[in-house]
Amino acid sequence: MKILATETKLGRRVQSGGCAIHCQNCSISQLCIPFTLNQHELDQLDNIIERKKPIQKSQVLFKAGDELTSLYAIRSGTIKSYTISETGEEQITSFHLPGDLVGFDAIMNMQHPSFAQALETAMVCEIPFDILDDLSGKMPKLRQQIMRLMSNEIKSDQEMILLLSKMNAEERLAAFIYNLSQRYSARGFSAREFRLTMTRGDIGNYLGLTVETISRLLGRFQKLGVLSVQGKYITINNMAELIELSGTNKNKIQLII
């Protein structure tokens, strides 16, 4: 899978999808399971992966309570993870980008505790968990990479707890935008110009803020000259000031990619 870039009317580099056959041809493989594997190991991994048809916007990949049968590596698009409370309220827990693996939180009980839903048309690689588990026992590099990815997810959860407990509203949104810019940069896209694939409502839900607060803060950031907003497109004009607004240095939080 190659992540391609297209030019919009606004001249921004936007994520889009194109198909490829093997893991070694995937432009985000360094962020995914294939990283560090040799050719023979890549071939073994390739043999168990099912490259699914496009998942349409709003389509659910799996639901809370579903049995864990596979992990899903995102090839293109964005997927959100969320839970639903007893009162029917949705709580977003993660936004997954290309290179991320979805489904790790189901390993303990072999049952998904959350939902995964596409925020836009997405492509995923389905990796049968039982076969992957067996392969990882035979391939130390594969096992190490899975452990690295799981550790990364745990650290991300810890940073989110710190963000919500230590930061005010302005710092939360600034940290979110900065973290998103770094994640896009790691995937070969511009760190300064990108499209928000999630709604302001989704961002507010994730950060524990209202839609009105998100809109007000985006307006404030624009007035300060930190960033420009045009619809879903964000342009970061002053990265240093954005980092300062995020309070990551003050709170000693290192947001992960």
From Swiss-Prot:
Its cofactor is [4Fe-4S] cluster. One of its GO terms (molecular function) is metal ion binding. Residues 167-240 form the HTH crp-type domain. Binds 1 [4Fe-4S] cluster per subunit. SMART domains: cNMP, HTH_CRP. [4Fe-4S] cluster binds at C23, C26, C32, C125. Coiled coil: none annotated. Induction: By anaerobiosis. Residues 200-219 bind DNA. Residues 23-32 are annotated as: Essential for the oxygen-regulated activity. One of its GO terms (cellular component) is cytosol. Gene3D superfamilies: Jelly Rolls (2.60.120.10), Winged helix-like DNA-binding domain superfamily/Winged helix DNA-binding domain (1.10.10.10). Keywords: 4Fe-4S, Activator, DNA-binding, Iron, Iron-sulfur, Metal-binding, Transcription, Transcription regulation, Virulence. SUPFAM superfamilies: cAMP-binding domain-like, Winged helix' DNA-binding domain. Pfam families: cNMP_binding (PF00027), HTH_Crp_2 (PF13545). Homodimer. PANTHER family: CRP FAMILY TRANSCRIPTIONAL REGULATORY PROTEIN, FUMARATE AND NITRATE REDUCTION REGULATORY PROTEIN. It is involved in the activation of genes necessary for anaerobic respiration. It probably also activates genes involved in the production of virulence factors. This is Anaerobic regulatory protein. The gene is fnr.
